């Protein structure tokens, strides 16, 4: 006879995550991102990771440490899924402390791990709702363009993002301290 605990184990697909395992405590701040069933680039079983490249990563103090952080994850089942990401809390102005998570106003980074190939892909998302910026009421992703970021770069040896192994070009430019890029046309 199967116990309720065993049944629950099979019903909760998030327990199948192997690559994107969120290691943050819940802060109470969150961001909903919907991945619509119209996405054709994903395979059933792909793991989706939501990142902030400039998240608050310290906890319990006001050291304002910034870095990449995995904030939410889910497994693509072939139909719409919703992933909730964990937001940071910063009460330092009131004599409090910070908790790790995304920072409102930062760009959402979506990565996909495909177990069938063992490759982690970067992505460019198309949003049917929201802007791709943390702090939106919610976001809906209608399409994802996946690429192996280890092969991204430029085939021009004089470029700042030259990669002799690159299989496609990425256009890169700077805006203050932020490096921006897009796939070349």
Question: Over which residues does each language-model region extend?
Answer:
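Primarily marks secretory-pathway-exposed extracellular/lumenal segments that are disulfide-
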Residues: 1-185
């Amino acid at each position: 006879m199967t116990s309720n605990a065993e049944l629950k184990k099979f019903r909760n697909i998030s327990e199948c995550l192997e690559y994107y395992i969120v290691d943050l405590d819940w802060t109470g701040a969150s961001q909903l991102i919907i991945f619509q069933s119209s996405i054709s680039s994903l395979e059933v079983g792909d793991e989706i990771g939501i990142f902030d490249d400039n998240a608050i990563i310290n906890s319990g103090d006001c050291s304002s440490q910034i870095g990449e952080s995995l904030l939410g994850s889910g497994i693509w089942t072939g139909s719409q899924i919703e992933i909730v990401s964990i937001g940071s809390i910063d009460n330092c102005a009131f004599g409090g402390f910070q908790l790790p998570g995304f920072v409102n106003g930062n760009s959402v980074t979506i990565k996909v791990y495909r177990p069938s190939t063992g490759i982690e892909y970067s992505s460019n998302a198309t949003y049917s709702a929201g802007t791709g910026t943390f702090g939106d009421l919610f976001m809906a992703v209608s399409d994802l363009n996946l690429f192996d970021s280890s092969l991204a770069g430029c085939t021009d040896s004089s470029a700042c993002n030259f990669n002799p192994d690159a299989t496609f070009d990425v256009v890169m430019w700077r805006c203050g301290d932020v490096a921006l890029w897009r796939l070349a046309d």
